[in-house]
Amino acid sequence: MASIASWIYDKPLRGNYTFTHDEVAQAFPDMSAGSIARALTREVSKGRIMSPLRGFYVIVPDEYVLRGAVPQSFYLDDMMHHLGRKYYVALLSAASYHGASHQVPLRFSVMIEPPAMRDKKGEKYLTHFFCKSRIPEAYVERRQTRTGYINVSCPELTAVDLLTYQAKTGSVSRAATVLAELAEKLDFGRLAADFVKEVPVTSLQRLGYILDEVLEEGEVAESVYSLLKCSGFVLQYAPLKAGKSSEGCERNAKWRIIVNETIEIDEL
């Protein structure tokens, strides 16, 4: 009978890089729980597998053994399917999928629906989970990876999220720097009108202002403005930087933005 180690190493030959404790137990019904646990612990100690989630394992390809971890893109889809959770790769991590590589993310950002999940932290990786009330699946792309597929927010949703979660991504200036790289991928005219219902209107206002007044991406900015106009929302004034005093600050009438922050774009 094959050993657990050989069973594990055979899986990548079939294109599988993840497995669960239950799968091992089913494959080795005559083996005790203690023996299975010891066999898996040995493979973890050798760096051949890792466990980002209790009962869920990732097979580490040879080229990643010395690092002791693999990119989250290798296993995230399988892990979230195992948990029965909807998700998408978001914020700076999503922006990198769309070619915005100037701001290299130090953590892998994943958007989920409630209930919240604890961040997954290992010696070589950090996955940060953000919650929103509903995953707008129509605006999530299915991207192919080396080991399968992964869900990534479309460029437009990525752009809006960067401003919705500006406090989590560093600053408005950092978000604007990423938007400068994303701009050529943005076309809000291609989106259905219900997109406005899926995101905070204030984030669209901030995005439109930055595209229009800071990045001078007039055509893209107009596609945002047209989407807002078609939605029928009556825009209210909102601060450019959430949570910061806006007393006495300049007001932009078109976007209904209170300019309470000076934006500085990094050189690209």
Which residues does each PLM region occupy?
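Short beta-edge/loop segments at beta->alpha junctions of small alpha/beta modules
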Residues: 2-86, 183-205, 211-212
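A residue-level signal for conserved active-site and pocket-lining positions in enzyme catalytic cores
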Residues: 24, 94, 159
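Hydrophobic/aromatic-lined pockets within catalytic cores
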Residues: 29, 84, 99, 164-167
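Short amphipathic alpha-helical segments with coiled-coil-like heptad repeat character
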Residues: 32-33, 102-104, 167-171
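Short gly/ser-rich loop at a beta-strand->alpha-helix junction or flexible surface loop bordering the NTP-binding
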Residues: 51-63, 69-135
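Hydrophobic alpha-helical interaction segments
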Residues: 140-268
